[in-house]
């Protein structure tokens, strides 16, 4: 089982405990894949789906798409475009952030977002 598939299965089952529309069959229909394929994804028998399908699954499961993409070993296409424009800077930025506590990273993100830099 993959981290991606396991996460999707656990999240879907948690939601299904209170909402029966989260069966494999019904979720598969809403994200436009075959139920057998989604079942195989959950069991880790096939590779995670495309970015488009992962984003649909994330929306249905009320999970941040970047979290599911990361679990699938993928990076969203919008982030890929940003990284390709400045690969050295982003590589170094990520390496520097690696050792920082989450609270410090969040503070830095807020400062950049709010223009306080």
Q: What are these model-derived regions, one by one?
A:
Residues 1-20, 107:
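A short, Lys/Arg-rich alpha-helix, primarily the initiator
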Residues 12, 42, 53, 61, ...:
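DNA major-groove recognition helix of helix-turn-helix
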Residues 17-40, 70:
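Short alpha-helical DNA-recognition segment
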Residues 17-18, 45-50, 76-78:
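Short, solvent-exposed alpha-helical "recognition" segments
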Residues 32, 51-67:
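DNA major-groove recognition helix of helix-turn-helix/homeodomain DNA-binding modules
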Residues 35, 51, 68-81:
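Amphipathic alpha-helical "recognition" segments
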Residues 73-117:
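Interfacial/linker helices and their anchor residues that mediate assembly or domain coupling
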């Amino acid at each position: 089982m993959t981290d991606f598939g396991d996460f999707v299965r656990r999240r879907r089952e948690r939601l299904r405990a209170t909402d029966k529309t989260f069966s494999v069959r019904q979720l598969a229909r809403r994200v436009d894949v075959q139920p057998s394929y989604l079942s195989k994804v959950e069991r880790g028998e096939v590779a995670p789906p495309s970015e488009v399908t992962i984003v649909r699954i994330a929306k249905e499961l009320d999970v941040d798409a970047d979290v599911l993409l990361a679990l699938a070993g993928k990076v969203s296409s919008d982030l890929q475009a940003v990284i390709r424009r400045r690969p050295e800077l982003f590589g170094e930025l990520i390496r520097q952030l690696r050792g920082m506590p989450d609270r410090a990273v969040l503070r830095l993100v807020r400062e950049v977002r709010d223009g306080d830099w």
